């Protein structure tokens, strides 16, 4: 899976499972290419969302929900993910 496919899949899965006002996903893999632990095919993503759900549940619970939604992608394709909830 390439980065564009991964971003598309992540965005789609989150949009289907969380009520969003805004979502932006950035590829930050280039910041980690020189690290010893960098693996080809594993990506670093920055996820920025604004959700009406955060009014119902706190940021920690929303973050847990995102991790559950992206479980497969985290195991196979995502080395690290930064989640910003506005």
Task: Label every PLM stretch briefly.
Residues 1-86:
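N-terminal, polar/charged subdomain of small-to-medium soluble alpha/beta proteins
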